Swiss-Prot record:
Enzyme class: ligase
Protein name, entry field: Asparagine--tRNA ligase
Gene this protein is translated from: asnS
Enzyme Commission no: 6.1.1.22
GO CC, any one term: cytoplasm
Protein source organism: Pectobacterium atrosepticum (strain SCRI 1043 / ATCC BAA-672) (Erwinia carotovora subsp. atroseptica)
Length: 466
């Protein structure tokens, strides 16, 4: 007996007339008047289920087969045969059906065979991967993650595991989750009445990381080309379709690289991973195009074949001011472009992905390299048609005096960044990098509108279930 995944049978990788066993869950069961049952079995290896044809001459047909309902787990042995019906090329002529697990009460089973609202599925996040939608999202998420690692490996990058607990605020925004073992009901105090964090586990204030970038830079200054890929955390009280409190980030850091170098890297990365999804997840993408977003496949195909446009922030503002379109958010030099501005540039003006460069220093982080004009920094955003910003990056400030000036300007204590400043004291180099939010990437690929539905267990304000 050979146990095989459903995908191998459906894709013809198992010889016709072979006896195999598949293990999975019942999606549907229908019975014919001729005493034959058709069981759709899925195991998550691909989008489509495998049809098992079960005759009533099986010894447990009456007691087990006719009691099967959506969600029951089964182990079915049979012969692979060409399917005479539409919808699949192969099916399984069952010779044995073993019920591994029953659904206690089919009438109250939360994942009964019907369409559920996306809001309802969030309430049963432990069961929602059994649905077509979330199962497809999970496979695409996996394929994207594998493609990202593959891209960087093939291009000579080293993956660096950066810490989740940190004492540094990379973005300087202060929206961080505190990590503490202090007794909240009996906090130690200093003579000034403040919380005495010297008594805490780490002997100082500690937080969940908002970015692996600063730590990644230390390894780029030794290994040249590195990237991080891991969870990050923002205590931002935002209840929007684009925000999560816990999400994953991809952050390459490249030694001796300019802003233009990492803009090219961003373009190559996105095109590589999008092509991987088109090649490897055709069945799931066909589902997204049919049920979620009819442009899901064509959007990726067009993206892969498009040349990225490039524009300076100052010129982008001029384009927006002179386009004749009314925006909800005002446009002026110095404003942080909103999603509607970004989408106009990518969808209406350039009609292609676009890299906006050289932003005003006042709306960007302390570590971004100051340009010669003293007003802008070497920062970039990659804007994609259909979503807006998908990547944010910059050339990092490698000059110690300029970095110290920015820290002071932004009210940050340079002593807190002593180790980061050391990189500028000992063999400093120009270097650049960017951040790519993984969940926003998945949402863009699948057409799923809310990032809460592209991560297994979303963490949002007032929600940390499961």
């Amino acid at each position: 007996m050979s146990v095989v995944p459903v995908v191998d049978v459906l894709q013809g990788r198992v010889a016709v007339d072979s006896e195999v066993t598949v293990r999975g869950w019942v999606r549907t069961r229908r019975d014919s008047k001729a005493g034959i049952s058709f069981i759709a079995v899925y195991d998550g290896s691909c989008f489509n289920p495998l049809q098992a044809v079960v005759n009533n001459n099986l010894s447990n047909y009456q007691d087990d087969v006719l009691r099967l309902t959506t969600g029951c787990s089964v182990e079915i042995t049979g012969n692979v045969v060409a399917s005479p019906g539409e919808g699949q090329s192969f099916e399984l002529q069952a010779t044995n059906v073993n019920v591994v697990g029953w659904v206690d009460d089919p009438d109250t089973y939360p994942m009964a065979a019907k369409r559920h609202s996306i809001e309802y599925l969030r309430e049963v996040a432990h069961l929602r991967p059994r649905t077509n939608l979330i199962g497809a999202v999970a496979r695409v998420r996996h394929t994207l993650a594998q493609a990202i690692h593959r891209f960087f490996h093939e291009n000579g990058y080293f993956w660096v595991s950066t810490p989740l607990i940190t004492a540094s605020d990379t973005e300087g925004a202060g929206e961080m989750f505190r990590v503490s073992t202090l007794d909240m009901e009996n906090l130690p105090r200093t003579e000034q009445g403040k919380v005495d964090f010297s008594k805490d586990f780490f002997g100082k204030e500690a937080f969940l990381t908002v970015s692996g970038q600063l730590n990644g830079e230390t390894y780029a200054c030794a290994l040249s080309n590195v990237y991080t890929f891991g969870p990050t955390f923002r205590a931002e009280n935002s209840n929007t379709a684009r925000h999560l409190a816990e999400f994953w980030m991809i952050e390459p850091e490249v030694a001796f690289a300019s802003l233009d170098d990492v803009a090219a890297l961003a373009e190559n990365l996105l095109k590589y991973v999008f092509q991987a999804v088109l090649n490897e997840r055709a069945d799931d993408m066909a589902f997204f195009a049919e049920r979620v977003d009819k442009e899901a496949v064509t959007r990726l195909e067009k993206f892969v074949s498009s040349d990225f446009a490039q524009v300076d922030y100052t010129d982008a503002v001029e384009i927006l001011l002179n386009c004749g379109q009314q925006f909800e958010n005002p446009v002026y030099w110095g404003v942080d472009l909103s999603s509607e501005h970004e989408r106009y540039l990518a969808e209406q003006h350039f009609k292609a992905p676009v890299v906006v460069k050289n932003y005003p220093k006042d709306i960007k982080a302390f570590y971004m390299r100051m340009n010669d004009d003293g007003k802008t920094v070497a920062a970039m955003d990659v804007l994609a048609p259909g979503i807006g910003e998908i990547i944010g990056g910059s050339q990092r400030e490698e000059r110690l005096a300029a970095l110290d000036s920015r820290l002071e300007e932004m009210g940050l204590n340079k002593e807190d960044y002593w180790w980061y400043r050391d990189l500028r004291r000992y063999g400093t180099i120009p270097h650049s990098g960017f951040g790519l939010g993984f969940e926003r990437l998945i949402a863009y690929v699948t057409g799923v509108q809310n990032v809460r539905d592209v991560i297994p267990f979303p963490r949002t304000p007032r929600n940390a279930s499961f």
